[in-house]
From Swiss-Prot:
GO cellular component: cytosol
Enzyme Commission number, as recorded: 1.1.1.86
NCBIfam families: ilvC, PRK05479.1, PRK13403.1
Gene Ontology BP term (one): L-valine biosynthetic process
Name recorded for this polypeptide: Ketol-acid reductoisomerase (NADP(+)) 1
Gene: ilvC1
PROSITE patterns, per database record: KARI_C, KARI_N
Family of the protein in this entry: Belongs to the ketol-acid reductoisomerase family.
Keyword Metal-binding: yes
GO molecular function: ketol-acid reductoisomerase activity; magnesium ion binding; NADP binding
Enzyme active site: H108
Catalytic activity: (2R)-2,3-dihydroxy-3-methylbutanoate + NADP(+) = (2S)-2-acetolactate + NADPH + H(+); (2R,3R)-2,3-dihydroxy-3-methylpentanoate + NADP(+) = (S)-2-ethyl-2-hydroxy-3-oxobutanoate + NADPH + H(+)
Species whose genome carries this gene: Streptomyces coelicolor (strain ATCC BAA-471 / A3(2) / M145)
Amino acid sequence: MAELFYDADADLSIIQGRKVAVIGYGSQGHAHALSLRDSGVDVRVGLHEGSKSKAKAEEQGLRVVPVAEAAAEADVIMILVPDPIQAEVYEKDIKDNLKDGDALFFGHGLNIRYGFIKPPAGVDVCMVAPKGPGHLVRRQYEEGRGVPCIAAVEQDATGNAFALALSYAKGIGGTRAGVIKTTFTEETETDLFGEQAVLCGGTAALVKAGFETLTEAGYQPEIAYFECLHELKLIVDLMYEGGLEKMRWSISETAEWGDYVTGPRIITDATKAEMKKVLAEIQDGTFAKNWMDEYHGGLKKYNEYKKQDSEHLLETTGKELRKLMSWVDEEA
């Protein structure tokens, strides 16, 4: 079973005694910086010249400085810019400002796991990753609660890296809910697999295949959209609240019987075998290399895929149907 840590296991004074730089001010960056500040931590935000986030961070009472200056001032540096640019930011603005005893923190392990960033031997390398979007992390913190986090140490130069990670997690409210100890390898590989095989890739492909099966059989696209995409939220919400058991308790017996007898015909042994291939490509670095090559090569295929899906009948049908739904905010 996983090791869990709570408020009583973490010493907030450790992070309160450090100088923290949060690099980036997106979804997670703003939640980390504001919550650490409110926990009595000395925080500055590091942003590149011309960042649109600068005004927002300053309006919220945070000190904003260039990334290199933030890294030079701080002894705990949390990198929360997008994965594909982390190595560039590290090489340009952070690497030469690291001192022995400093700590390099990440919210996701990709760049460490695949060696795109190679920290010096004298610094701690840690991860603190809330299992929820930044706005939820911040809201829960403000309400006196927290979002569960995972924490890991890749390099313990000081001998106190995990205690520092727990202290950081406490500063953003994570230990109120619970912190699970993991490794950079486990977090990275399971996160990428979940995104690709289930949450994003698997779900999107399943929805499209179901929609196409119905429309190709002559059913109206609008009806197919409701049955294969719109109602997915109802099911996922039930699973989120109480697992498969609550979902099955809440649906009709007809739907539940169909679940048992038809689900295995859709997700077959062949599907699971393909999932294992996907996992192997994540484990051996193939996916990470291909993604970085695609990103730094100009995102040609990425943009082609994006354009194709935006023109799919599923998307054009949904865009029109959502106009009928006053409770759905198209701008959100």
